[in-house]
Regions:
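Membrane-embedded and interfacial regions of multi-pass energy-transducing membrane proteins
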Residues: 2-639
Length: 639
């Protein structure tokens, strides 16, 4: 095994050979420039950045669809959108938000930040990382292309059978949905496997499991949840595709199938997905609160255990969505208990944050404002969640706008607000520029006001009986005034998000130079330049506490690992529990094979919509691409 050493003899950059060694590292870890070379990048920061930017674009597109639906619903018997187009917009909005925005952007944040936070130079499988992004991008582009050519799915983002079956949805749109959902989840699974391997085996020496940043813990829990939650929805979408294309009748009662099987498979994924989205946001909140209170998080162990508990308990909630399907009430009672029980670890998180904030001199910068807004919105969403966990109450409000209100309070308040706080927080690290505080405060104010103006009145609509998933309603129902008010609120909410997008855009060129650690934070990503070099760290740091930067500043010294080659893409491997140095792994260089493999797999998946023979074509093309990917190369061919 190659030997590495730990030294603490002052700043390495002060040595005479530092410039030459840095230049060698720059050449070794270079990401090729140019448009064609864009398809060969494997660096984790570039791939993570692409995930984040692409997800935000899909978020904006889903928002536009939502505004169009609100315009349709702002007055009774409106004819702006017909029922078919409304159903397409509704399906595309939900599918985009759940599959193309929420999970990918959380994975993208993990891909970008986790290697920096744990003190390593790249992900465990860089080419697999790139492959996952190209799969995700291809699926998203094809799904939105289906909308523009009139082939979009229209049976809802949940694709309930028999409505999503061939008999009631004969159009090709649902074939597109079933195929692309399976395809998209390949991307999610590749990222999850990579993140687990990277976190367990590439932490800097000394970063034992009980010293990991809470965001890294959150990403680890999220990754394991993805590994267990995504296969059921992939199985369900494949079975539905076989029903539609080969008349297999898994969900057709006349053929011996069972429609409720779809709901069991889908919601076994669907409810954990809410927490797949939420758990990384909880980690973001902890990192931001630590920085802006200038104190370690209160109850670190309790915070970690509550994250793990959320991951476990979330898999026992799927029948929470099926209280009105006729299942035995004795069985439903257990899911009511589980639905109430998951509030306990969530409450532990909130009380630990409050304890950290209590008595602190808080800096009320924009990231912190988004976190404080989260507290108010998420608590409301959590309270209504406990309400719909009660079977008698759920029977009354199921499939009404009360559930729409609850759902959006939890996901926008619980995930999107912390996410935008995290974007303001880590934007200086990614770009080297600070975002405008003035625009950030205005954006937060509009988002917070617009969110409440849009979704709080929906509780009342639901209690008055307005069903969700309808494209119009009669004037005599008396829902017109509230819907008009909600539509106005939706445009205020959209203006808030648009202001943040504008802030991101102009700050790239007009923002103040950030420096390496503008927030005076404590975690390792702030020990690098902004933006970091392609290799992240000139020397791998040694971690001695949960707040390494603060403690190194107090001790006025910093221990570093030496011995890794500057001429090869080497990373340090450490033990799983205590992060003791164990070995060195040589990573592959940039290549176009992940992009070509993604295209080959896409041809097989998308082509099968029109002919089974495309699967054969995609299979053989994928085989040749994998051979090219894995073909051994001599050292000079890796340059």
């Amino acid at each position: 095994m190659k030997q590495t050493r730990i030294r603490s003899d002052g700043p390495i950059s002060a040595r005479p050979d530092a410039d030459e060694a840095t230049a060698t590292l720059d050449r070794t870890w270079l990401s090729p420039p140019g448009f064609v070379s864009w398809f060969t990048h494997v660096n984790h920061r570039k791939i993570g950045y692409r995930f984040i930017v692409t997800s935000l674009i899909f978020f904006a597109l889903a928002g536009i669809l939502a505004l169009m639906m609100r315009l349709q619903l702002m007055s009774p018997e409106n004819s702006l959108l017909g029922p078919e187009l409304f159903n397409q917009f509704f399906t595309m909005h939900g599918t985009t938000m759940m599959f193309l925005f929420a999970v990918p952007i959380m994975e993208g944040m993990g891909i970008y930040l986790v290697p920096l936070m744990i003190g390593t130079r790249d992900m465990a499988f860089p080419r697999l990382n790139a492959f996952g992004y190209y799969v995700y991008l291809t699926a998203g582009v094809v799904l939105f292309a289906s909308l523009f050519i009139g082939m979009a799915p229209a049976a809802g983002w949940f694709a309930y059978v028999p409505l999503a079956g061939k008999a009631f949805s004969p159009e090709v749109g649902m074939d597109v949905w079933t195929t692309l959902i399976t395809f998209i989840e390949i991307s999610a699974l590749t990222a999850a496997v990579e993140l687990v391997a990277t976190i367990f085996k590439q932490r800097a020496p000394g970063m034992s499991l009980d010293r990991m940043p809470l965001f890294v813990w959150a990403i680890l829990v999220m990754s394991f949840m993805i590994i267990f939650a995504m296969p059921p929805v992939m199985t369900a979408s494949v079975l539905l595709m076989l029903d539609r294309t080969l008349d297999m009748q898994f969900f057709v009662v006349a053929g011996g199938g069972e429609p409720l099987l779809w709901q069991h498979l889908f919601w076994f994924f669907g409810h954990p997905e809410v927490y797949i989205i939420l758990v990384p946001a909880l980690g973001m909140i902890s990192m931001i609160i630590t920085t802006f209170t200038r104190r370690p998080i209160f109850g670190y162990t309790a915070m970690v255990l509550s994250l793990v508990a959320i991951g476990f308990v979330s898999f026992g909630l799927w029948v929470h969505h099926m209280f009105t399907t006729g299942l035995p009430h004795l069985g439903l009672s257990f899911f009511t208990a589980a639905s109430a029980m998951i509030t306990i670890p969530s409450g532990v998180q909130i009380f630990c944050w409050i304890a950290t904030l209590w008595g602190a001199r808080i800096r009320f910068a924009t990231p912190m404002l988004f976190i404080l807004g989260f507290f108010a919105i998420f608590v409301i969403g959590g309270l209504t969640g406990v309400m719909v966990a009660s079977i008698p109450f759920d029977m009354q409000v199921h499939d009404t706008y009360f559930v729409v209100a609850h759902f959006h309070y939890v996901l926008i308040g619980g995930a999107v607000l912390p996410l935008f706080g995290a974007i303001y927080y880590w934007y200086p690290k990614v770009t080297g520029q600070m975002m405008s505080e003035r625009l950030g405060r205005w954006s937060f104010g509009l988002i917070f006001a617009g969110l409440n103006l849009t979704f709080f009145p929906m509780h009342q609509l639901g209690l008055e009986g307005m069903p969700r998933r309808v494209y119009t309603y009669l004037e005599v129902m008396g829902w017109g005034s509230l819907n008009l008010f909600i539509t106005a609120g939706a445009f205020i909410l959209a203006a808030g998000f648009a202001l943040s997008f504008w802030n991101m855009f102009i700050s790239r060129t007009r923002g103040i130079n950030a420096g390496p650690n503008p927030w005076q934070a404590d975690s390792l990503e702030w020990a690098t330049a902004s933006p970091p070099a392609n290799y992240n760290f000139r020397h791998i740091p040694v971690v001695r506490s949960r707040t390494p930067i603060w403690d190194d500043e107090a001790a006025d010294e910093r221990q570093l690992v030496t011995g890794l080659s500057n001429e090869r893409r080497e990373i340090l491997l450490t033990t799983v529990l205590d992060a003791e140095p164990q070995g060195v792994l040589i990573l592959p260089s940039p290549t176009i094979w992940p992009f070509l493999l993604a295209i080959a797999v896409a041809l097989g998946f998308i082509g099968i919509i029109f002919s089974p023979w495309w699967f054969v074509v995609g299979f053989f093309l994928s085989f040749f691409m994998i051979v090219g990917w894995l073909w051994p190369r001599r050292p000079w061919q890796e340059e």
